[in-house]
Swiss-Prot record:
Intracellular or extracellular location(s): Nucleus; Chromosome
Family statement drawn from the similarity comment of this UniProt entry: Belongs to the histone H4 family.
Residue(s) carrying N6-acetyl-N6-methyllysine: 6, 13
Native organism: Diadromus pulchellus (Parasitic wasp)
A Pfam cross-reference name: CENP-T_C
Source organism phylogeny: Eukaryota, Metazoa, Ecdysozoa, Arthropoda, Hexapoda
Protein name (database record): Histone H4
Assembly behavior: The nucleosome is a histone octamer containing two molecules each of H2A, H2B, H3 and H4 assembled in one H3-H4 heterotetramer and two H2A-H2B heterodimers. The octamer wraps approximately 147 bp of DNA.
Length: 103
C-alpha cells in the first residue's frame, strides 16, 4: 500500500472504460428458489410453474418505477449519487413507506 486510502490509483479520477460489460437479462438473477422463498414468506403452499417468469416481469416493472423516481429526486438535488433517502422517498411516493433507513 502506498498510503492513498481505499480510493484507487491516485492521479485524477481515471479515464473512460474501454470495455464495459453489457448488462443483459439481469432479471434472471432472481432465481426460482428466491421467488419460492418470497412466496413461502407470503404463506403460499404450492406454486405454478408459470409464476416464475410472471414474477420476474412484475418485479422488473416495480423496480423500474422505484429507480426512475429515485433518480428524479437525485437529479433535482443536483447530485450524481443516488442515496438511500432517495429510494425511501421514491417508495413513499408510491405508497410503500419503508422504515429504518433514515429520515
Amino acid at each position: 500500500m502506498t498510503g492513498r486510502g481505499k480510493g484507487g490509483k491516485g492521479l485524477g479520477k481515471g479515464g473512460a472504460k474501454r470495455h464495459r460489460k453489457v448488462l443483459r437479462d439481469n432479471i434472471q438473477g432472481i432465481t426460482k428458489p428466491a421467488i419460492r422463498r418470497l412466496a413461502r414468506r407470503g404463506g403460499v403452499k404450492r406454486i405454478s410453474g408459470l409464476i416464475y417468469e410472471e414474477t420476474r416481469g412484475v418485479l422488473k416493472v416495480f423496480w423500474q418505477n422505484v429507480i426512475r423516481d429515485a433518480v428524479t429526486y437525485t437529479e433535482h438535488a443536483k447530485r450524481k449519487t443516488v442515496t438511500a433517502m432517495d429510494v425511501v422517498y421514491a417508495l413513499k411516493r408510491q405508497g410503500r413507506t419503508l422504515y429504518g433507513f433514515g429520515g
